A protein has these predicted regions:
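Catalytic domains that recognize anionic headgroups
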Residues: 1-462
Length: 462
């Protein structure tokens, strides 16, 4: 009995500590919940904008634009790179290449086996804002919601503290309560504060539980709630609200001539039905749209994000800052296992290549006209190169001293199909412990299985 009581006190202490850590990370989000400008673009200089939409699917873009001529016009000047591959089908491995380029692909991360994974992950997140503010000419920067920052489920933006020219925020869930106040007619859903309080408690259990039990406790983010409709809505709206308020979160008062923004949003990661044609949350869905994916909730939730993003782009145009803005819209991975463009065979049945087909849309300075498509072989690790091009020549990674470029792509992209997606899934703190035969080198046309060549990576055995 004494031992049981002692164990109980220890666990209670762990829960309190976990909850305290949750509050600390949440408090450092830098946002009070009040909707006001936090992103300050430049009216006269250059704006370089990275929009990271977690799990946004490349193959959905064209049907969305065909469905809405207005949306297509809002994305004027953009090029959709259809032949783009990602390096994994999960954020933990798939996000670092987006932020840090080819030095942070899974294979390259594993080569630096003397450094902890969390340290290399943080390097990737910090690389671009540091380059722009330290190697660029009169740049300030902002970053929001950087996925897995400091390997924390809620991004731990304390990693930005040493860099005063970089502002950092967590917008996820920050505006959820305000959104409900502004949209009281959305539905007869229970007030979100109870759900949030419940999840905060369960999150503390998650943080203090043995690693082997965390996946069970997390239960795909629902924490075993029986109110699945409300949980799905809150999960989606916690991110959607930031997209819906994006115009209100943006002004044009940059204190420096030039501005870099890295904005991450996770709304696409939750499949949820929205009301077409504008794809907005509604208590009753009477119109699912007329695209070929009309019944697909993943399509619907992404359409909601793209429509709000289109409204923001229109806002930039109205304020004269569209032409002086370079914008990249990219994701870490996709989610549909099987897509039409892929020529299906036994190899693709194992790989599920659609999961590695991220959105990659780019608009350069002064670009205009109808959206174009491009079939050049790309990876989402091309993001830093394309954003830095012509602005900071010979850019150098401030953490490694190596040049930032896309030369490693010349030999193809070394993709891992590993299904490990939480930090505790890896048996090493320094490398991704991927199965040796879970690697494929991808090149040229990603839709043909002959261009996915299996390789064995011995270092993954460490």
């Amino acid at each position: 009995l004494v031992s049981l009581m002692l164990l109980s006190f220890i666990q209670i202490g762990k829960v309190k500590a976990g909850y305290k850590e949750y509050l600390r990370v949440s408090a450092e989000g830098g946002i009070s919940g009040k909707v006001k400008p936090i992103f300050h673009l430049s009216k006269t200089g250059k704006n370089v904008i990275l929009i990271f939409l977690d799990r946004a699917q490349n193959n959905f873009v064209e049907p969305m634009l065909e469905e809405s001529p207005k949306l297509k016009e809002q994305f004027s000047g953009f090029t959709l790179y259809k032949n783009t591959v990602s390096f994994n089908s999960h954020t933990l491995i798939g996000a670092p290449p987006v932020h840090g380029g080819y030095e942070y692909t899974p294979a390259e991360i594993n080569k630096r086996a003397d450094k902890p994974l969390v340290e290399k992950h943080n390097e990737a997140i910090l690389m671009l804002p540091r380059i722009f503010t330290e190697q660029g000419d009169n740049f300030s920067a902002a970053s929001s919601d950087a996925s897995w920052a400091n390997y924390s489920w809620i991004p731990d933006i304390s990693i930005f503290k040493p860099y005063p020219k970089i502002e950092s925020f967590v917008t996820e869930n920050a505006y959820l309560a305000q959104w409900y106040k502004d949209h009281q007619g959305v539905g007869n859903f229970t007030i979100t504060s109870d759900t949030l309080k419940r999840n905060m408690l369960w999150y503390s259990f998650f943080r203090t539980s043995p690693l082997i039990l965390r996946h069970v406790i997390y239960e795909s983010g629902s924490y075993w709630s029986t109110n699945t409709q409300n949980e799905d809505l809150n999960k989606y709206l916690g991110n959607y609200a930031a997209m819906d308020y994006l115009k209100d979160l943006t002004d044009f008062s940059s204190k420096t001539e030039n501005y870099f923004l890295s904005f991450t949003n996770n709304a696409c990661h939750t499949s949820f039905a929205l009301q077409a044609p504008d794809y907005v949350p509604s208590a009753k869905i009477t119109d699912r749209g007329n695209s070929e994916y009309a019944g697909d909730n993943s399509y619907s939730s992404m359409a909601g994000v793209m429509h709000r993003l289109g409204e923001w782009l229109e806002y930039l145009k109205q304020n004269g800052v569209y032409e002086n803005s370079r914008i990249l819209i990219v994701s870490d991975h996709s989610c549909s296992s099987k897509e039409k463009p892929y020529k299906w065979d036994e190899k693709f049945s194992r790989i599920s290549p659609g999961k590695y087909h991220p959105i990659f849309m780019f608009k350069d300075f002064n670009e205009s006209g109808e959206l174009k498509t491009n079939n050049d072989f790309m990876t989402n690790a091309d993001s830093p190169t394309i954003l830095l091009s012509g602005i900071i020549e010979n850019a150098v990674n401030p953490f490694t001293g190596n040049p930032v470029n896309s030369k490693l792509k010349e030999d193809g992209a070394l993709v891992t199909i590993s299904n490990l997606y939480m930090p505790h899934h890896f048996s090493s703190k320094n490398i991704f412990t991927v199965k040796p035969d879970d690697w494929y080198r991808v090149s040229d046309n990603i839709f043909e299985s002959k261009n996915w060549k299996q390789e064995t990576m011995e270092e993954s055995k460490k």
